[in-house]
Amino acid sequence: MDALKLLTTNVKFKNKVPQPSIKEKEAKKLQGITKGKAKVTGNNPVDPIEEFPEGILCENLKKQNITECTTIQRYAIPTIGSKRDLLACAPTGSGKTIAYLFPILQKLQLHVPGGYRAIIVAPTRELCEQIYRQAEKLSFGTSLKIIELSKSNEKIQEKAPKLREKYDMCIGTPMRLVQAIQTGLSFEKVEFFVMDEADRLFEPGFIEQTDHILSACTSSNICKSLFSATIPSRVEELAKVVTVDPIRIIVGLKDAATDSIDQRLLFVGSDTSKIVILRQMISNGELKPRVVIFVQDIERAKALYTELLFDEIHVGVIHGELPQAKREEALAKFRKGEIWVLIATDLLARGIDFHGVKMVINFDFPQSVHSYIHRIGRTGRAGNTGQAVTFFTKEDGEYIKLIAGVMRSSGCEVPNWVMALPKPSKEMKKKLKKSPPKRKRITTRASYDRQKEQRKKEYIKKVKKEASIKKHNEATGDSGQ
């Protein structure tokens, strides 16, 4: 790698075509998500539809200002409606949720007591909540009953198992669904089974739970659908095992981001420079709310949140250690615009839909191509445009080729010297995915100040402990001698 180029170049990738007018942009946005190319393979694929079938579901979509089918919806709706197993890969923000909810709700038609007839599995509580909200909107005015398995209603169902017969569709994370099965939940009447973010559900930590759930679906008439924005070859092989004669739909290029995102690589030198450069971007007015900033882990999320809080920025944070109520509160404030900048770990990278996210910043370099695609997919959704900026250090340089490949396949222009960089080996990619690099702490305070603050905290802790012991001794009459 040419170190001089890395040290002196901020690489910006723009679409090759001249910038069109605003009116042309709007037309192109709509055309991109509704008339995009799709590669369909499998035995006797079903013909695509051109518009949503008329009826109450279509009317409910119109209330959300959704009047045209996206590409994935044109192909997936008739496929699932014909009860064909499906493996679907489409860019983030292309309407995958409606692509499977619409045909399932249409086929279920009316509420039928006796147990769940449709199961939707998603890797995170936040994504399940989002799917549930869309299902409620779409089924409004029907007699269909939908439930999202969560901590709040789990105990109610355990105490009153017959309540389960009230619902037609169940949405939940693998853990929640496995727990429900263990308490007596039956999936024997399930007609439709959907895996959203299927590649994640086939990863270690989820695959055993996913297998448990699939084993509980014993109906011979079940239709299985797997959706994701990225589907690695390994996942395709596993999908063939759990599906029967599936139709495979790939919208656009496999493992590519949508072309509605302006992607940029920004060399920052070292980890310690990142916060300074981020503040420069803020002061230059480069950050247009709303912004999502991705970091490598929970500790770095907390640290960056503290730094930006001191700058009096409307900032929030979401990570796995936050209680569910706090996570939901942060997401709600971000949606309402009360929070302008949301700091997140990869917990937020998958599936969650925010309207109006203008920019994504990868403060820490993503650990895989799939992580990159899902992260930047929080912007440029539903035909809107967005920006994605990825910080990289000298240590990250050997992995740039991975990201550059995604950029080029997404229709962006990439300098030849970047494409000439060697590809990281399989071993290097596995190492990065398994164990992210150790990074220096996020702070602009001097080491002396940090040590001073730590000593102060330790002193306060010691004083409180001594006071507690003294109070206990006085209460028990123990002199401590």
From Swiss-Prot:
InterPro entries assigned: DDX52/Rok1_DEADc, DEAD/DEAH_box_helicase_dom, DEAD_box_RNA_helicase, Helicase_ATP-bd, Helicase_C-like, P-loop_NTPase, RNA-helicase_DEAD-box_CS
Q: Where in the cell is it found?
A: Nucleus, Nucleolus
Q: Where is the composition biased (Basic residues)?
A: 428-443
The Basic and acidic residues compositionally biased stretches are 447-475
Residue positions binding ATP: A90, P91, T92, G93, S94, G95, K96, T97
Keyword annotations: ATP-binding, Helicase, Hydrolase, Nucleotide-binding, Nucleus, Ribosome biogenesis, RNA-binding, rRNA processing
One MF annotation (Gene Ontology) recorded for this entry: ATP hydrolysis activity
Major place of residence:
nucleus
The highest taxon in the source lineage is: Eukaryota
Q: What is its EC number?
A: 3.6.4.13
The Helicase C-terminal domain sits at: 260-422
User: Catalyses which reaction?
Assistant: ATP + H2O = ADP + phosphate + H(+)
Which GO biological-process labels does this protein carry? maturation of SSU-rRNA
Q: What class of enzyme is it?
A: hydrolase
Location of the region described as Disordered in the Swiss-Prot/TrEMBL record: 425-481
Motif DEAD box at which residues? 196-199
- Which family, according to UniProt? Belongs to the DEAD box helicase family. DDX52/ROK1 subfamily.
Function of this protein? ATP-dependent RNA helicase involved in 40S ribosomal subunit biogenesis. Required for the processing and cleavage of 35S pre-rRNA at sites A0, A1, and A2, leading to mature 18S rRNA.
Record's comment describing the protein's domains:
The Q motif is unique to and characteristic of the DEAD box family of RNA helicases and controls ATP binding and hydrolysis.
Subunit and partners: Interacts with the U3 snoRNA and is associated with the 90S and 40S pre-ribosomes.
Q: What is this protein called?
A: ATP-dependent RNA helicase rok1
Q: What is the lineage of its organism?
A: Eukaryota, Fungi, Dikarya, Ascomycota, Taphrinomycotina
